[in-house]
Swiss-Prot record:
SUPFAM superfamilies: N-terminal nucleophile aminohydrolases (Ntn hydrolases). It comes from the Eukaryota. It comes from Drosophila erecta. Pfam families: Asparaginase_2. Disulfide bonds join C90-C95, C189-C205, C344-C371. Belongs to the Ntn-hydrolase family. Residues 1-22 form the signal peptide. Gene3D superfamilies: (Glycosyl)asparaginase. This is L-asparaginase-like protein GG20738. GO terms for cellular component: lysosome.
């Protein structure tokens, strides 16, 4: 009898232990998973907040970036209007050479604009180039994207298109622009973009005629220096919390260019490119080189192939340097999660402005990167850019 009682008690005790262990095991599993989940949220964000909204612009004009960021923060579906606002703000504030006193006229003294915008969701592109008589070229480029089946309109036809949609006629060439052009003419039209012509393009203004092919020369290509305020193109990239991307660019073109020249701002993949499934990129530098290599497109495709933003940016710049040893310029790359990086060459350092991003450190903060060495440059110590200070009127606001 005593033995049966002991066995019964032992059985009950074993059942209780099994039940307790089961409860403890489930509780441990629950809290362990909860802890891992909390850690995942802390490191990477929830599924909803994994994407880091941000607004990036090239060079160090903080006010235009901040205006674009404020538009992006107004709600969903604002990436398009954000990049447009950034371009318009820079146009009105005369960022760099954009419409500043002594802007970038062509070799006939005329000031024309080019601009482009790209939708990363539909991969649609709208651009204008060589357009005279309209201040905010980005609005006309946006109209090309939204109201036509084309991607690029140029010259007087682009101006006529703008008029047909009600955009105000406003010719931008003024007395200051003419003075800059006259000074260039009095200096023998130096520098210019001609080659293998006669009379010599290094001493004369033309008109020119072609040299016979056996007299063609191949001088070392030496880039012009890019310094603070002496660039004529700015680009903006906007990414929202839903992963939607828009990129835009606006430019007054290379100074004293041959009339009719189209620059990188208007060419898909040269100055800007975006794909919501991968990310986006903006580039700045010698537009003719950028058009030959399409660095913004290459950067996005490099990320599609598995490279991280920093790897993609450096790979693109190294590729440019392999073919153009004196290249001056930069590329900024952003993946679809909002992780960004930049690389440059031919400058002491490259500046770009960021609002948002990881932890929202501050708004319109100027980020600086040291540039890659041009190890294979043919012209030793070729011209490089200098960016010693941020203009006082564009002091960095703190968020």
């Amino acid at each position: 009898m005593l033995a049966q009682s002991c066995c019964l008690r032992l059985l009950i005790l074993l059942l209780l232990c099994k039940s307790t262990c089961s409860v403890w095991e489930k509780s441990h599993k629950y809290f362990r998973n909860r802890k891992l989940r909390e850690r995942r949220i802390k490191w990477f964000g929830t599924k909803k907040t994994e994407i880091q909204p941000l607004l990036i612009s090239t060079w160090n004009y903080t006010d235009a970036n901040l205006q674009a960021w404020s538009v992006l923060q107004q709600g969903p579906q604002r990436t398009r209007m954000a990049v447009i606002q950034g371009c318009m703000a820079c146009q009105n504030q005369r960022c760099g050479r954009l419409l500043a006193g002594g802007s970038s006229p062509d070799s006939e003294g005329t000031l024309t604009l080019e601009a482009a915008i790209m939708d990363g969701e539909r991969l649609e592109y709208g651009a204008v180039a060589g357009m005279e008589g309209a201040r905010n070229a980005i609005l006309v480029a946006d109209a090309v994207l939204r109201h036509t089946k084309h991607s690029l309109l140029v010259g007087k036809s682009a101006t006529k298109f703008a008029r047909s949609l009600g955009y105000k006629e406003e010719f931008l060439t003024d007395g200051r622009t003419k003075n800059v052009w006259k000074k260039w003419r009095s200096n023998g039209c130096q520098p210019n973009f001609w080659r293998d012509v006669r009379p010599s393009h290094t001493e004369n203004c033309g008109p020119y005629t072609p040299l016979p092919e056996h007299l063609h020369q191949h001088p070392l290509h030496q880039e012009y220096a890019i310094t603070q305020g002496q660039h004529d193109q700015l680009a903006f990239l906007a990414l929202d919390a839903e992963g939607k991307l828009h990129v835009a660019s606006q430019s007054s073109g290379a100074p004293f260019r041959i009339p009719g020249r189209v620059g990188d701002s208007a060419v898909p993949g040269a100055g800007i490119y975006a794909d919501n499934k991968v990310g986006g990129a903006v580039a700045s530098g010698d537009g003719d080189i950028l058009m030959r290599h399409l660095p913004a497109f290459l950067a996005v495709e490099a990320m599609r192939a598995g490279k991280k933003p920093d790897q993609a940016a450096e790979w693109v710049v190294q590729r440019l340097l392999r073919h153009n040893t004196e290249f001056n310029g930069a590329v900024v790359v952003v993946n679809r999660r909002g992780i960004y990086a930049a690389a440059c060459a031919g400058l002491d350092e490259f500046h770009f402005v960021v609002s948002g991003g990881k932890e929202y450190l501050s708004m319109a903060r100027v980020e600086r990167i040291k540039c890659l060495e041009r190890e294979d440059e043919v012209v030793d110590d070729g011209p490089k850019g200098l960016f010693p200070t941020i203009p006082e009127k564009q002091a960095v606001p703190r968020g």
